[in-house]
Design a protein with these regions (language model features):
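Buried hydrophobic core positions in alpha-solenoid tandem helical repeats
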Residues: 118-120, 149-152, 178
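Caspase-like cysteine protease fold
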Residues: 60-144, 163
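Catalytic-core region of carbohydrate-active enzymes that cleave or remodel glycosidic bonds
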Residues: 11-49, 53-57, 62-82
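Hydrophobic core positions within HEAT/HEAT-like alpha-solenoid repeats
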Residues: 134-135, 151, 166-167
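Active-site proximal loops enriched in glycine and acidic residues that flank catalytic Cys/His/Asp
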Residues: 20-23, 49-52, 80, 91, ...
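Solenoid-like repeat scaffolds
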Residues: 123-125, 152-159
Length: 178
């Protein structure tokens, strides 16, 4: 992979790099671009890449806005990765919470993951990806009346990603509301 030789002469400053292509995270090879970022002279802390061919009809930036809420890269990855997708570097790395320091989404996702009352409340939060995660957790918790809630949310939301999350979850439920 001659393209990684470029990284021996530069210092990438991105703390997190997300590769959305096949083989960019092939850590098992002697030379891969994700490793070049991590082990080079730059300041990259964590990368995400795919080791082999990856499906093309995926949603690679799903929940990406949660990173602005201080969600750890590994925690985000747990919700979006496919079998061939990997974190290379520090999965505990996170950006500063610039959305709402009073909202600890890491804690919500791990400690309060079964708290449907909290997730219902977060459906009204002004951040689209927080709303998407709330829908996802209600789905995982088998919340009663979810197909109707997803249909209602789809019809009312001003956020495209929230509407997409509703369609995705309705599809996964094989719901006639879709």
């Amino acid at each position: 992979f001659p393209y990684t030789t470029l990284f021996r002469s530069i210092r990438p400053n991105a703390r997190f790099v997300m590769f959305d292509a096949c083989y960019n995270g092939s850590f098992h090879l002697d030379d891969c671009i994700a490793n070049a970022y991590i082990f080079g002279d730059g300041n990259t802390v964590v990368t995400q890449g795919n080791t082999v061919n990856t499906i093309q009809d995926k949603w690679p930036d799903e929940y990406l806005g949660l990173l602005a809420c201080g969600v750890r890269i590994g925690q985000w990855g747990r919700h979006v990765h496919f079998l061939e997708t990997h974190i290379i570097g520090d999965p505990t790395y996170h950006f500063a919470n610039t959305v709402d320091p009073a909202l600890d989404m890491n804690r919500a996702i791990v400690v309060s993951k079964k708290d449907n009352a909290m997730w219902y409340k977060l459906l009204n939060y002004p951040n689209a990806d927080v709303q998407c995660m709330a829908l996802r957790k209600l789905y995982e918790n088998h919340a009663p009346g979810l197909p109707e809630l997803l249909q209602k949310t789809y019809e009312a939301s001003l956020f495209g990603v929230v509407r997409m999350e509703c369609m995705k979850l309705l599809y996964q439920m094989n719901s006639p509301e879709l």
